[in-house]
UniProtKB/Swiss-Prot annotation:
Its membrane topology: Multi-pass membrane protein
Protein name: Photosystem I P700 chlorophyll a apoprotein A1
Keywords: 4Fe-4S, Chlorophyll, Chloroplast, Chromophore, Electron transport, Iron, Iron-sulfur, Magnesium, Membrane, Metal-binding, Oxidoreductase, Photosynthesis, Photosystem I, Plastid, Thylakoid, Transmembrane, Transmembrane helix, Transport
Subcellular location: Plastid, Chloroplast thylakoid membrane
Species the sequence originates in: Solanum tuberosum (Potato)
Binding site for chlorophyll a': 675
InterPro entries, alphabetized: PSI_PsaA, PSI_PsaA/B, PSI_PsaA/B_CS, PSI_PsaA/B_sf
Subunit relationships: The PsaA/B heterodimer binds the P700 chlorophyll special pair and subsequent electron acceptors. PSI consists of a core antenna complex that captures photons, and an electron transfer chain that converts photonic excitation into a charge separation. The eukaryotic PSI reaction center is composed of at least 11 subunits.
EC number: 1.97.1.12
Length: 750
């Protein structure tokens, strides 16, 4: 008789056919809500339909069902992303000058859009070089394609088709995992398993496969391109993968195969896994061999990290234990209870993820110019400016989203009866101290940062330059920042003995790198002007945080409205008969936070745009003399408000204002139109609902007179709807205005 250990029970983690697929139901507007499904009585119906369609919390209170809807929606989102990517690659294949750009990236601009002549719009097709006429693009796709080893438009076609297949696959997966095999709640809450798969699978194997692609395909192809070989002569990717001798000609260590790996003689691989630092002088981008090495190292770290958490085998960390062990001397119960919050409130989970992803996106913005990862990216000033601006805006929106979902968690998911003396409870109990101190910091920063500028404007107006804060009079040098720069500039040979150059040329020390007579990057000097504007950054960021954090900490209750939690996430006022209680909902804090986020990011991208044109970007003569686009005027001009208005906004707007009749005229029209969209927002923000309701009733009266009144009663927008429309147009108008201003300028002079 054989005694067996009991078989481990396999947990069934999916439900089969939980929701039937019904086109009839999908075709009924508002099928997710009993009230909305009845159809419209008033025009408010269409607003409620849009507001609640994706608010899954309002469709059901069953956490499992909500989780499944979110999970399924993620596949829909991925499908849209693949569709978008496919469109980008298709434009590269069908409408672009990619192959021409590849053969001469310093003299030919990237273009992937040719405008059809209908009523004269073909004026927009500017000459981008090499005899190609089209709209210059600034997305950085060409540089990315070159870095990944794409050498022909046929390869772009194939990738575009592949992305379409994946888009279809994702749509199918979204349907399948909601209607056919929907995961149970336990599956969504199994955090250790999720961590293992995401860390080892997505990040670990993802980085490893990218490192493999770089080593076997990108590096050899880029090696040939840098040497000036015609792209059509370069072997195709599969030839490098299948033929080891081909690679061994470029990287001798390939001849030895995996022997050095297993004999621990890893330094043999140093010909394609380097640790140089700095930029490749041919392309002005990071060394691609450094990047391959980086991805290999990252892959190893994440593969290890993906084996740290306890799943089926009973070994490893449990996240609940880690959190509950986290107790400081002053934090009471510490992180006890956080595990339950993060596994039952997807808003809390999303809030943390948005905060971290938003911060990471802003870090990406700063690395794209200081460590330009792709060949010929650094000398494409339009793309550099666009990538920085784009990632700053995205980061700002994500961080505001983090506050929004933190507040929704507080209102909908927070249970005060089970939370006592843990970290969150302690934060909430001393929220008055937090907010009043933060408010003081904002007032201090606001008066002092702005005061320095006002002082300078006044002294300048009175003709007393010797009494101004500037590099040539009263100096306020950013000594801490300069110390950090210096430390990094000295790091190679000290803290990083293998590296030949520092992580970024911007730190100082190194010479400039120029490609095709244009500056790619050089040490960025910091002075009084930067010190002043950095304190404006500190001010605007602190005010944004003040508004958002106050919204979160007072989302459930305040002295003014103790029962705020019962009123929900968004409400206009605390009912009739309680004056002075409007605009206090958590939603209103997000609304106000968006304006200050817009302020913060605007100052950052203005600072970046002017600083780079003044101190970095420009041309290099044969004698090595650098001529910057605005001739280094940042240090002396940006220290007064007047300087910002006169030498940045007005002086640099000349290109967009004078763009009519040229290939940049679309930016002139966008500049005008976006100003109009922005002004349109003020109509919603500075106007009361009653005004519009009265106006509508007069108009309805006229329709009744003529017997053309509709069955659906027109209603003025609610207060919340009006503010939502207002902030949307404010941001859309402001961002599009800035976009047109930046691009017309930098394409003309860059």
């Amino acid at each position: 008789m054989i005694i067996r250990s009991p078989e481990p029970e396999v947990k069934i983690l999916v439900d089969r056919d939980p929701v039937k697929t019904s086109f009839e139901e999908w075709a009924r507007p508002g099928h997710f809500s009993r009230t909305i499904a009845k159809g419209p009585d008033t025009t408010t119906w269409i607003w409620n339909l849009h507001a609640d369609a994706h608010d899954f919390d309002s469709h059901t209170s069953d956490l499992e069902e909500i989780s499944r809807k979110v999970f399924s929606a993620h596949f829909g989102q991925l499908s849209i992303i693949f569709l978008w990517l496919s469109g980008m690659y298709f434009h590269g294949a069908r409408f672009s000058n990619y192959e021409a750009w590849l053969s001469d990236p310093t003299h030919i601009g990237p273009s992937a859009q040719v405008v059809w002549p209908i009523v004269g719009q073909e004026i927009l097709n500017g000459d981008v070089g090499g005899g190609f006429r089209g709209i210059q693009i600034t997305s950085g796709f060409f540089q990315l394609w070159r870095a990944s080893g794409i050498t022909s438009e046929l390869q772009l076609y194939c990738t575009a088709i592949g992305a379409l297949v994946f888009a279809a696959l994702m749509l199918f997966a979204g349907w399948f995992h909601y209607h056919k095999a929907a995961p149970k709640l336990a599956w969504f809450q199994d955090v250790e398993s999720m961590l293992n798969h995401h860390l080892a699978g997505l990040l670990g194997l993802g980085s490893l496969s990218w490192a493999g692609h770089q080593v076997h395909v990108s590096l050899p192809i880029n090696q040939f391109l840098n040497a000036g070989v015609d792209p059509k002569e370069i072997p195709l990717p599969h030839e490098f993968i299948l033929n080891r001798d081909l690679l061994a000609q470029l990287y001798p260590s390939f001849a030895e195969g995996a022997t050095p790996f297993f004999t621990l003689n890893w330094s043999k691989y140093a010909d394609f896994l380097t640790f140089r630092g700095g930029l490749d002088p041919v392309t002005g981008g990071l060394w691609l061999t450094d990047i391959a090495h980086h991805h290999l190292a990252i892959a190893i770290l994440f593969l290890i990290a993906g084996h740290m958490y306890r799943t089926n085998w009973g070994i490893g960390h449990g996240l609940k234990d880690i959190l509950e062990a986290h107790k400081g001397p002053f934090t009471g119960q510490g992180h006890k209870g956080l595990y339950e919050i993060l596994t039952t409130s997807w808003h809390a989970q999303l809030s943390l993820n948005l905060a971290m992803l938003g911060s990471l996106t802003i870090v990406v913005a700063h690395h794209m110019y200081s460590m330009p990862p792709y060949p010929y990216l650094a000398t494409d000033y339009g793309t550099q400016l666009s990538l920085f601006t784009h990632h700053m805006w995205i980061g700002g929106f994500l961080i505001v989203g983090a506050a929004a979902h933190a507040a929704i968690f507080m209102v909908r998911d927070y249970d005060p009866t089970t939370r006592y003396n843990d970290l969150l409870d302690r934060v909430l109990r001393h929220r008055d101290a937090i907010i009043s101190h933060l408010n003081w910091a904002c007032i201090f920063l606001g008066f002092h940062s702005f005061g320095l500028y006002i002082h300078n404007d006044t002294m300048s107006a009175l003709g007393r330059p010797q009494d101004m804060f500037s590099d040539t009079a009263i100096q306020l040098q950013p000594v801490f920042a300069q110390w950090i720069q210096n430390t990094h500039a000295l790091a190679p040979g000290a803290t990083a003995p293998g590296a030949t150059a520092s992580t970024s040329l911007t730190w100082g020390g190194g010479d400039l790198v120029a490609v095709g007579g244009k500056v790619a990057l050089l040490p960025i000097p910091l002075g009084t002007a930067d010190f002043l504007v950095h304190h404006i950054h500190a001010f605007t960021i602190h005010v944004t945080v003040l508004i958002l954090l106050k919204g979160v900490l007072f989302a459930r209750s305040s002295r003014l409205i103790p029962d705020k939690a019962n009123l929900g996430f968004r409400f206009p006022c605390d009912g009739p008969g309680r004056g002075g209680t409007c605009q206090v909902s958590a939603w209103d804090h997000v609304f106000l936070g968006l304006f200050w986020m817009y302020n913060s990011i605007s100052v950052v991208i203005f600072h970046f745009s002017w600083k780079m044109q003044s101190d970095v970007w420009g041309s290099v003569s044969d004698q090595g003399v650098v001529t910057h686009i605005t001739g280094g005027n940042f240090a002396q001009s940006s220290i007064t408000i007047n300087g910002w208005l006169r030498d940045f906004l007005w002086a640099q707007a000349s290109q967009v204002i004078q763009s009519y009749g040229s290939s940049l005229s679309a930016y002139g029209l966008f500049f005008l139109g976006a100003h109009f969209v922005w002004a349109f927002s003020l109509m919603f923000l500075f106007s009361g609902r009653g005004y519009w309701q009265e106006l509508i009733e007069s108009i309805v009266w006229a329709h009744n007179k003529l017997k053309v009144a509709p069955a659906t009663q027109p209603r003025a927008l609610s207060i919340i709807q009006g503010r939502a429309v207002g902030v949307t147009h404010y941001l859309l108008g402001g961002i599009a205005t800035t976009w047109a201003f930046f691009l017309a300028r930098i394409i003309a002079v860059g």
